[in-house]
Design a protein with these regions (language model features):
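Conserved beta-sheet core of the metallophosphoesterase superfamily
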Residues: 92-99, 112, 117, 123-128, ...
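A structural signal for the main folded, soluble domain(s) of proteins
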Residues: 24, 240-242
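Short histidine/acidic/glycine/proline-rich micro-motifs that form metal-
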Residues: 10-13, 119
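Active-site-proximal loop/helix segment associated with metal-binding centers of metalloenzymes
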Residues: 114-175
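A short acidic, often aromatic-flanked loop/helix-cap motif at beta-alpha or helix-coil junctions
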Residues: 103-106, 222, 242
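Divalent metal-coordination and catalytic microenvironments
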Residues: 9, 37, 42, 64, ...
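Core catalytic region of metal-dependent phosphoesterases/phosphodiesterases
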Residues: 2-3, 12-106
Length: 242
């Protein structure tokens, strides 16, 4: 049976090799069987540029290349941690970068794909940060710096983000319901798949003249979350990470 997989928020990092091992296992199991694998942002804890050819990054790229060489398609979307993923990375991995807000046909169902951070409109401080780092001029300026400088800046941003989040109300860091309705109506879809919030769940959404569904992927911690879509259904599931 044809099916497509979605994952997000793996936050791959050298300090957590078990997550990369779990991803390698997932891709080995489904490579050549699944129609496609979509990674909806925050694949890496940080990505400071495609020229950062560490052994860990090269291992991840090799795993993606093995998967894509089986004939299964591979798609990457930027998240709030890995917005510097570029064309060189995608080419080496054998995948394709897709934009936030891409609509795909899942066996007759039109689904809107997002990382999910743009849906958290009440977190105004974060949205200002997002607008800054998504500017091509800012990214180009970042990439002209040395790897050591970029790493230091990324570490500083991560620490600042953690400190900011400690003082935020939980609802501010979740999606804004009105924004969810707006983007789904604008895209003309009944289904939205996203990550970012680390709150895996399936939500019913009241649209103007119909009910929709919001599918939320979880982050990879002690378990790995994924969505499997086929012509029969869409399922949110998880498996333990050793």
């Amino acid at each position: 049976m044809s099916y497509t997989l979605f994952i997000s928020d793996l936050h791959l990092d050298e300090s957590r090799p078990q997550h990369l091992a779990a991803l390698e296992h997932l891709m080995k199991e489904h490579g050549g069987v699944a129609d496609a694998l979509y990674i909806l942002g925050d694949l890496f804890e940080t990505w400071i540029g495609d020229d950062n050819d560490s052994a860990f990054n090269l291992r991840a790229i090799s795993a993606f290349k093995r998967f894509s060489s089986t004939g299964s398609k591979l798609f990457f979307m930027h998240g709030n941690r890995d917005f510097l993923l570029g064309g060189d990375f995608a080419q080496q991995a054998g995948g394709t970068l897709i934009a936030e807000g891409t609509v795909v046909n899942l066996y007759g169902i039109q689904a809107l794909l997002m990382h999910g951070d743009s849906l958290c409109t009440e977190d105004e401080k974060y949205q200002q940060f997002r607008a800054m780092v998504r500017q091509p001029a800012w990214q180009q300026g970042m990439l002209t710096k040395s790897l050591a400088e970029r790493r230091a800046i990324a570490d500083g941003m991560r620490m600042q983000s953690q400190q900011n989040n400690e003082n935020k109300a939980a609802n501010i860091m979740d999606v804004t319901p009105e924004e969810v309705v707006r983007v789904m109506e604008e895209a003309g879809v009944n289904d939205l798949i996203h990550g970012h919030t680390h709150r895996p769940n399936v939500h019913s959404v009241q649209l103007a003249d119909r009910m929709g569904t919001r599918w939320v992927l979880g982050d990879w911690g002690n378990s790995a979350w994924l969505i499997r879509a086929s012509k029969d259904d869409i399922e949110l599931t998880n498996f333990d990470i050793a």
